[in-house]
Amino acid sequence: MARFFYDSYSVLAYLSDSPGYAAYFEKNTGVLTRLNLMEIYYAILRVHGATAAHEVLEAYSAREIEFSLLDVETAMKLRYELRKLELSYADAMGYHIAKKEGLKFLTGDKAFEGLPGVEFIP
C-alpha cells in the first residue's frame, strides 16, 4: 500500500468524483496538514455549506500530520526557491512535508507538473 501526501487539490478532486483519483484514496493511504484542512473546509463551505464542510473536516482530520517551526522555515525557503510557480503557503508546506517523509505529493495542480516527487493527475 503506497502512502501519499494529499494536496488540497487532490482531496477536492476526489470528493468531486474527478477521474483518476479514486484509487489513490480507496486503495492507498495519505496524509495532509492542518493548512490543507483549512483550504478544503473553506472550499466545501463556499459551495455546499457548513454542515458538509464539517463532515469533510471530521473525515480527513485523522489524516493530519503536524509540522514544526523548522518545517515552516524549510517550506518557506522552498516557496522562495520556487517563487515563479506562485505556490501558496499550504502548497509549499505540503510539498516540503512530502519530501521530508518520503511520500509522493498527489495533485492535479499544474504548478507541480514535472517536479520531482509529484504524482500528477491531469
For each of these PLM feature ranges, what is it?
Residues V47-T51, L82-R83, I121-P122:
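Short, hinge-like loop/turn segments at secondary-structure boundaries
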Residues Y6-D7, L32-R34, L87-S88, D109-K110:
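Histidine- and aromatic-rich ligand-binding microenvironments
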Residues V11-L12, L37, F112-E113:
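A generic structural signal for short hydrophobic patches within well-formed alpha-helices
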Residues M1-L32, A43-E55:
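Short, well-structured N-terminal submotif of metal-dependent ribonuclease cores
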Residues I65-K104:
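Active-site neighborhoods of divalent-metal-dependent phosphate/nucleic-acid chemistry enzymes
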Residues M38-Y41, L57, M76-R79:
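Amphipathic alpha-helical segments within well-ordered protein domains
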